[in-house]
Amino acid sequence: MPIRKSNTYLSLVNSYLIDSPQPSSINYWWNVGSLLGLCLVIQIASGIFLAMHYSSNIELAFNSVEHIMRDVNAGWLIRYIHANGASFFFICMYLHIGKALYYGSYKSPRVMLWVIGVIIFVVTMATAFMGYCLVYGQMSHWGATVITNLLSAIPFIGKDIVPFIWGGFSVSNPTIQRFFALHFLLPFILAALVCMHLMALHVNGSSNPLGITGNVDRLPMHPYFIFKDLVTVFVFLLVFSLFVFYSPNTLGHPDNYIPGNPLVTPPSIVPEWYLLPFYAILRSIPDKLGGVIAMFGAILILLTLPYTDRSFIRGNSFKVLSKFMFFLFLFNFILLGNLGQLHVEVPYIELGQYATAFYFAYYLLIVPAISSAENILYYIGTKK
């Protein structure tokens, strides 16, 4: 017996990366998972090196970032890798979620896989938000103030939670220090969740574009899919390098190069681009508590999909109505992202409210209605 099968630890690697049977029909959308793993490794590695030189004292935070950029050997490179790595992490994550929505990867028997994936998404957003606050530029300070203030909308306990998080009466030194501690801890929790995600995936294996269970026609992970993954890894590294070396601040905000000043409010307060769709949903609801519920509900509503999608057939590859509504939903999500960075004024307010209504209607009304209608058509077709 080869050592990769007989050794206790290597046998785990073997069962996941070498002999793992994969459907022969999976396409390049299934490669995004490996890119997410690469992004997580890049973020943890670059983050550890940045933490060696970063100071979480509010008086020194901004200057310590500038010290990394100017005085530390290759500090500018590590900082830009970490900053752009966060953006690319979310690009890959949104692609991964989009693939799952299109191909029905959330349906039974992969519900646990989907639930863990949504938890990973939530933890990643929390980690990214706290990391953005650590730079302590203008947008960091005011972003931290606005987002943490949202918790004051929670009935009865909200007014007490906000000072508890701040460690005072405003965003101050204790806030940045606890954000730094949590920002350092959460990626390792993310890594543990990713291991759980892989374990859940290993139980039933990957789905496929056809939406059928193809246990007969499978290929080993190595060499076929390992080399296929390497193709997208090299393409990813090429595009990532173009941003890091030639356009490192494109995905950032210029106001964050101004030191945080609680006495000067920026013309518009916007979070990083990957949080904008949910920020637009928050702003589209006039009531503060309603907006907070809508924003968190917009993320957690992903958990309802395994139950609201009643279709017999997994995925949208052969379903015209579902495919059309999915691409309409995709356009709507991109529209929300654009509205999140615009000023709160007419006509963007009304447009944001319509887009928010469609976002929730897709999960709660459109998916159940269309899946039920397609089931009837499927039943009529098979009877004939």
Curated annotation (Swiss-Prot):
Component of the ubiquinol-cytochrome c reductase complex (complex III or cytochrome b-c1 complex) that is part of the mitochondrial respiratory chain. The b-c1 complex mediates electron transfer from ubiquinol to cytochrome c. Contributes to the generation of a proton gradient across the mitochondrial membrane that is then used for ATP synthesis. PROSITE patterns: CYTB_CTER (PS51003), CYTB_NTER (PS51002). Heme 1 (or BL or b562) is low-potential and absorbs at about 562 nm, and heme 2 (or BH or b566) is high-potential and absorbs at about 566 nm. A ubiquinone binds at H202. Heme b b562 binds at H82, H183. CDD domains: cytochrome_b_C, Cytochrome_b_N. It comes from Candida parapsilosis. Pfam families: Cytochrom_B_C (PF00032), Cytochrome_B (PF00033). This is Cytochrome b. Fungal cytochrome b-c1 complex contains 10 subunits; 3 respiratory subunits, 2 core proteins and 5 low-molecular weight proteins. Cytochrome b-c1 complex is a homodimer.
